[in-house]
Amino acid sequence: MALFRGMWGVLRTLGRTGVEMCAGCGGRIPSPVSLICIPKCFSSLGNYPKKPMSSYLRFSTEQLPKFKAKHPDAKVSELIRKIAAMWRELPEAEKKVYEADFKAEWKVYKEAVSKYKEQLTPSQLMGLEKEARQKRLKKKAQIKRRELILLGKPKRPRSAYNIYVSESFQEAKDESAQGKLKLVNQAWKNLSHDEKQAYIQLAKDDRIRYDNEMKSWEEQMAEVGRSDLIRRSVKRPPGDISEN
């Protein structure tokens, strides 16, 4: 399982353009976003039909163990790149075999979904759709965060309070995380104005670091055609930089 979890992580780094897995891969490598299949409906009610793997993912899951056996010391990222290259060079006739399997399973899947929904009450169906929307939004946000991490977006600046917490949390004498945070929070409130000024200055320095790194990063994004990630305007949060 760890091997395939690693595979999923690397697959999302292979490129931005491509067709979505859920629509079938064709000859192009899926994008980081499309590599994560988000079920149109998923419910905690259980027994929801499992969505079939795309042609490319099916090929990848077949090839990864073989590559791992041949190259036991190689990183998963290196193996995935080799598999991606192998897929690109795969004859169209062989790709069509994978695509045909996907289409056949997709048809069975859609029929199973229809039968599953027929068994639900109106209230259960509404709950299913609501849950699906929430999961899609949550997954979309997760994918966006992961993409920004992969693209090296600078970490946001920390407030004076957050810097103090990161320095003091482990030293707090309490076994529970909640207890530690409570102690650290009280200790912050008890700091004198002069003591807090040191952390406020660190926060200001971190803001300068962030602004400089963001300027450089956005220039890089413009160069690689990702202007959609560039801020239209820089908005500073209201309030003192020391606020938590």
UniProtKB/Swiss-Prot annotation:
InterPro entries per UniProt: HMG_box_dom (IPR009071), HMG_box_dom_sf (IPR036910), HMGB (IPR050342)
Tissue: The mitochondrial isoform is widely expressed while the nuclear isoform is testis-specific.
UniProt keyword list: Activator, DNA-binding, Mitochondrion, Mitochondrion nucleoid, Nucleus, Phosphoprotein, Repeat, Transcription, Transcription regulation, Transit peptide
PTM characteristics: Phosphorylation by PKA within the HMG box 1 impairs DNA binding and promotes degradation by the AAA+ Lon protease.
Modified-residue entries (Phosphothreonine), positions: T121
Span of the transit peptide along the chain: 1-42
GO cellular component: cytosol; mitochondrial matrix; mitochondrial nucleoid; mitochondrion; nucleus; protein-containing complex
Region (Disordered): 221-244
Sequence positions bearing N6-succinyllysine: K66
A molecular function GO annotation: transcription coactivator binding
Phosphoserine modifications at: S54, S55, S60, S159, S192
Domain remark text: Binds DNA via its HMG boxes. When bound to the mitochondrial light strand promoter, bends DNA into a U-turn shape, each HMG box bending the DNA by 90 degrees.
Complex and partners: Monomer; binds DNA as a monomer. Homodimer. Component of the mitochondrial transcription initiation complex, composed at least of TFB2M, TFAM and POLRMT. In this complex TFAM recruits POLRMT to the promoter whereas TFB2M induces structural changes in POLRMT to enable promoter opening and trapping of the DNA non-template strand. Upon metabolic stress, forms a complex composed of FOXO3, SIRT3, TFAM and POLRMT. Interacts with TFB1M and TFB2M. Interacts with CLPX; this enhances DNA-binding.
Name of this protein: Transcription factor A, mitochondrial
Organism per entry: Rattus norvegicus
Gene behind the chain: Tfam
